């Protein structure tokens, strides 16, 4: 094997090491190694300022000899680590006979704001042999209730001195706020609880408190604002101290959307902070934001706006303004406003945005009065600049995703977003600067206004890639360069559009949480990144944004405030929770969202007649070659709405089943069947579309959502194949149809055709954009071509993840890793090797540990390496031309303790595998 060999070698090495260690150790050879990767709720590791007083506990079993599965566990929870494991004062689960090692509910004493909690777990293996106790884990709750806040909202009235933006919108001047305070004793512990109506950066005694980017993030501000907790113990000392906070408009007080929408176009940005200090003598002090603070708008950040960029005037720098020595006599008194109950203050539910990757400039293009720096990767974030300048000159920094054929910046697709930063130099020499309260989508950076006597150097510009602070969750690679580039484009599209919320695009005057884009890409995102907490947090925003009539807005948070809905978009509220549940096994995501799902299905029903939908729809958005030239494509809106009505009813029924709500399950199953019957009667006859335009998507919806009677499904499949054949074996699908294409063709046995569609080089196809130089997924199948240039439409994002939904099929079918039971308790590993591939590999972190699948065809032999994590089982399908040729670890296959034959068919063998690492080989030719 050549692909991901290191993954399997390290797995074997770890296994060998622990076997050796367990043999050699004389400390306690009868006790198993402790559990690992302990987390709470949606994957948090020892969080500070946690949001939930009723967490769940999860862990993984170690990869060691003797640990196949879990037969029992015990969790102990205490208010002090000294009480563990023998004297837990908050909860002792006692020994529970269960294989469950994930999402176990806390059932102890009530927890309260600020409380620090410590916990451990031990498990018993399949032979009832006990493990060591795990290392002590902890979490600390944030301020859970508005009543916990004694601080006030503070700030200056900045609208009066604001400047007009590109759409005559008011841009609020960024504010600088500070407070000097005295502590009489040595500090034992200090917590800073802080948030903003806007975005903030905070420092204490001249030291940055964190490296968070634009906290607290983006939520439905009229319903909820998230708060952040920082441990600032090491930044505070006895005596005089100073806290300083910068605040800018961000999402809260800036314009959003192409229609100049706002959360508040009149309210000035504000901060809310509460510093709680415990002294070594046990006394306490609280420093709160109130009317004793002072502030100014005369700092160096003159303008900061998400769409238009940031302006920094170094002449106005205020050295040491967050230290005790700074003189603020010319600063103003702030205005103070009480915390009310109308807007909920809650600890942040997922990770903040961070600066994650730094890209180097790869090429410089010199112009008469400018230099263009090419990072050779479309990215999202800000530039890090080290540029020589003359005193008083202004450096202009522009951004673009691509260059026009004549070498000029292509910015038509930014629309009204100016996306331009400025730096005004206060002295001669090299300036070092990075914007703070804006972000851009770009590959190219153009500089003008630098010292013309200097020759531009690549080290002048670096790209700082910023996105929500999640880790990778899987990997995929293959023998095909363009398929690997597609995987890279999917990952970079995810990075670029997971900026606190799932955005449609990161560069133009939108960057909003479009629900349709989110629902089609959600499953793929979970293969590539650890984004459960990200999605769970955003789904709370979806719940908070749901209209009283049950409708779900186009975008969440709902800054458009137009009361409109769309089928296929609003259905995010049923699709995402179910997809998350099936990939994590966490019932909690269904419990949280079940009421919303029911309300949405009721809204579907209210906007239908005789079960046929009359709901508005963006439809199969950006379908290629539309007959009417419309962005909404050719598939009937009523057909789409009815299909999603049925699908959401079915998912709600399945959710009710998981939650044990039998009567409601029956109600929604009956509704699904009624809608499906009405769908078929209205739009199909003998499996063929009638009365509306027949499209690939119309058949895909009918088949994927199981809306046809059994006797008509086969004809519908043939009609779909005819539509694909009429398109010269190319797709004709937009946002809603594309994610269903691979699923339906797979289920109908048309694997060769799906491979053909995936590996097509010409428009419309995934490789078409790659052939034009794409490094991210595009909004349109034809956003650009080398022959014809840019699509003339300004709605032409070059970083738009929707068509990256194909990534789900790449993981689940090319390499074959899929759940057979919710949460991967039972795993399917069923790769489908096909030309032009000769190899493919993937890894995936499941709730139980890493699963891996790697195959290669060589000398008419399939080599398949598989990793099955502890506490799971896997059904492994091995394609072969000769079942008698199957070998495992270089030995002829026989039934044994760890591998049992399930089925032996003509072209494949199915085996039930226990946890472990296996190397299969069998005769197979492409």
UniProtKB/Swiss-Prot annotation:
Signal sequence, start to end: 1-25
Residues the record marks as active site: 510 (proton donor), 779 (proton acceptor)
Catalytic activity reported: Hydrolysis of terminal non-reducing alpha-L-rhamnose residues in alpha-L-rhamnosides
Source domain of life: Bacteria
Membrane recorded as keyword: yes
UniProt binding sites for alpha-L-rhamnose: 504, 508-510, 517, 569, 800
Location relative to the cell: Cell membrane
EC number: 3.2.1.40
Lipid linkage positions (S-diacylglycerol cysteine): 26
Annotated InterPro entries: 6-hairpin_glycosidase_sf, 6hp_glycosidase-like_sf, Alpha_rhamnosid, Bac_rhamnosid6H, Bac_rhamnosid_C, Bac_rhamnosid_N, Ig-like_fold, Rhamnosid_concanavalin
Function in brief: Alpha-L-rhamnosidase involved in ulvan degradation. Ulvan is the main polysaccharide component of the Ulvales (green seaweed) cell wall. It is composed of disaccharide building blocks comprising 3-sulfated rhamnose (Rha3S) linked to D-glucuronic acid (GlcA), L-iduronic acid (IduA), or D-xylose (Xyl). Alpha-L-rhamnosidase converts Rha-Xyl-Rha3S, the product of a sulfatase acting on Rha3S-Xyl-Rha3S oligosaccharides, to Rha and Xyl-Rha3S. The enzyme is able to degrade p-nitrophenyl-alpha-L-rhamnopyranoside (PNP-Rha) in vitro.
Protein's UniProt name: Alpha-L-rhamnosidase
């Amino acid at each position: 094997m050549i692909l991901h060999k290191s993954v399997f070698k390290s797995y074997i090495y770890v296994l060998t090491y622990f076997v050796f260690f367990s043999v050699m150790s004389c400390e306690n050879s009868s006790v198993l190694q402790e559990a690992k990767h302990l987390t709470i709720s949606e994957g948090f590791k020892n969080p500070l300022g946690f949001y939930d007083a009723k967490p769940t506990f999860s862990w993984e079993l170690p990869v060691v000899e003797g640990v196949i599965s879990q037969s029992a566990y015990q969790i102990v929870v205490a208010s002090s680590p000294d009480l563990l494991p023998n004297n837990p004062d908050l909860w002792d689960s006692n020994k529970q006979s269960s294989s469950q090692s994930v999402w176990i509910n806390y059932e102890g004493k009530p927890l309260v704001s600020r409380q620090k909690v410590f916990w451990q777990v031990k498990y018993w293996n399949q032979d009832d042999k006990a493990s060591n106790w795990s290392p002590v884990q902890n979490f600390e709750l944030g301020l859970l209730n508005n009543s916990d806040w004694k601080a006030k909202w503070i700030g200056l009235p900045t609208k009066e001195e604001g400047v007009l933006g590109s759409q005559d919108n008011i841009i609020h001047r960024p504010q600088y706020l500070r407070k000097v305070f005295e502590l009489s004793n040595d500090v034992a512990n200090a917590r800073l609880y802080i948030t903003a109506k806007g975005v903030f950066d905070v420092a204490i005694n001249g030291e940055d408190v964190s490296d968070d980017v634009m906290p607290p993030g983006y939520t439905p501000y009229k319903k909820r604002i998230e708060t952040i907790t920082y441990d600032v113990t090491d930044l505070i000392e006895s005596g005089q101290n100073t806290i300083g906070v910068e605040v800018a408009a961000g999402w809260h007080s800036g314009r959003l959307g192409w229609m100049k929408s706002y959360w508040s176009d009149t309210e000035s940005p504000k901060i809310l902070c509460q510093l709680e200090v415990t002294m070594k003598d046990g006394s306490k002090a609280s420093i709160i934001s109130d009317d004793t603070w002072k502030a100014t708008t005369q700092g160096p950040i003159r303008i900061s706006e998400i769409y238009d960029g940031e302006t920094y005037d170094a002449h106005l720098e205020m050295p040491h303004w967050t230290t005790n020595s700074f003189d603020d006599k010319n600063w103003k008194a702030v205005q103070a406003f009480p915390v009310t109950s109308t807007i909920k203050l809650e600890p942040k539910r997922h990770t903040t945005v961070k600066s994650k990757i730094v890209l180097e400039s790869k090429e410089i293009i010199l112009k008469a009065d400018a230099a263009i720096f090419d990072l050779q990767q479309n990215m999202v974030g800000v530039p890090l600049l080290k540029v020589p300048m003359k005193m008083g000159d202004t450096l202009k920094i522009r951004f673009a995703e691509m260059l026009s054929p004549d070498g000029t910046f292509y910015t038509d697709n930014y629309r009204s977003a100016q996306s331009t930063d400025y730096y005004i130099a206060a002295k001669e020499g090299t300036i070092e600067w990075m914007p703070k309260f804006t972000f851009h989508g770009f590959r190219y950076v153009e500089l003008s206004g630098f010292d013309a006597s200097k020759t531009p150097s690549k080290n002048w510009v670096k790209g700082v890639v910023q996105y929500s602070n999640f880790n990778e969750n899987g990997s995929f690679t293959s023998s095909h360069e363009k398929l690997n580039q597609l995987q890279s484009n999917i990952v970079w599209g995810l990075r670029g559009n997971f900026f606190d919320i799932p955005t449609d695009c990161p560069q133009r005057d939108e960057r909003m949480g479009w629900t349709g884009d989110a629902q089609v890409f959600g499953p793929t995102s979970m293969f590539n990144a650890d984004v459960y907490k990200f999605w769970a947090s955003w789904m709370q925003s979806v719940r908070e944004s749901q209209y009283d009539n049950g409708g779900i807005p186009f975008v969440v948070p709902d800054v458009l405030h137009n009361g409109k809905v769309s089928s296929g978009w609003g259905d995010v509220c049923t699709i995402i929770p179910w997809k998350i549940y099936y990939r994590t096994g966490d019932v909690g995501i269904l419990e949280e969202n079940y009421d919303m799902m029911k309300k949405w299905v009721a809204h579907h029903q209210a906007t239908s007649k005789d079960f046929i939908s009359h709901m508005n729809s963006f439809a199969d958005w950006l379908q290629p070659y539309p007959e009417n030239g419309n962005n909404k494509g050719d598939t009937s809106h009523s057909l789409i709405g009815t299909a999603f009505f049925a699908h959401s009813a079915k998912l709600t029924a399945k959710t009710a089943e998981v939650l044990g709500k039998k009567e409601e399950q029956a109600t929604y199953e009956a509704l699904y069947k009624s809608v499906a019957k009405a769908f078929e009667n209205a739009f199909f006859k003998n499996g063929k579309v009638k009365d509306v335009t027949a499209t690939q998507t119309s058949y895909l919806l009918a088949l994927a959502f199981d809306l046809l009677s059994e006797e008509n499904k086969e004809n519908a499949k043939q009609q779909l194949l005819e539509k694909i054949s009429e398109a010269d074996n190319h797709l004709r699908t937009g946002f809603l149809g594309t994610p269903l294409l691979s699923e339906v063709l797979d289920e109908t046995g048309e694997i060769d055709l799906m491979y053909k569609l995936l590996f097509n080089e010409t428009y419309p196809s995934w490789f078409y954009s790659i052939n034009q130089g794409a490094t991210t997924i595009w909004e349109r199948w034809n956003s650009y071509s080398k022959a014809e240039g840019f699509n003339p439409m300004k709605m032409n994002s070059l970083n738009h993840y929707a068509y990256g939904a194909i990534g789900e099929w790449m993981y689940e079918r090319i390499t074959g890793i899929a759940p057979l039971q919710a949460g991967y308790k039972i795993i399917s590993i069923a790769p489908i090797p096909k030309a032009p591939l000769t190899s493919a590999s993937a890894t995936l972190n499941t709730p139980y540990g890493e699963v891996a699948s790697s195959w290669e065809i060589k000398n008419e032999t399939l080599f398949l390496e598989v990793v099955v994590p502890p506490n799971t089982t896997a059904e492994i399908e091995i394609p072969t031309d000769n079942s008698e040729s199957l070998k495992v670890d270089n030995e002829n296959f026989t039934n044994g303790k760890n591998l049992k034959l399930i089925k032996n068919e003509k072209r494949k063998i199915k085996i039930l595998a226990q946890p472990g690492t296996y190397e299969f080989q069998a005769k197979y030719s492409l």
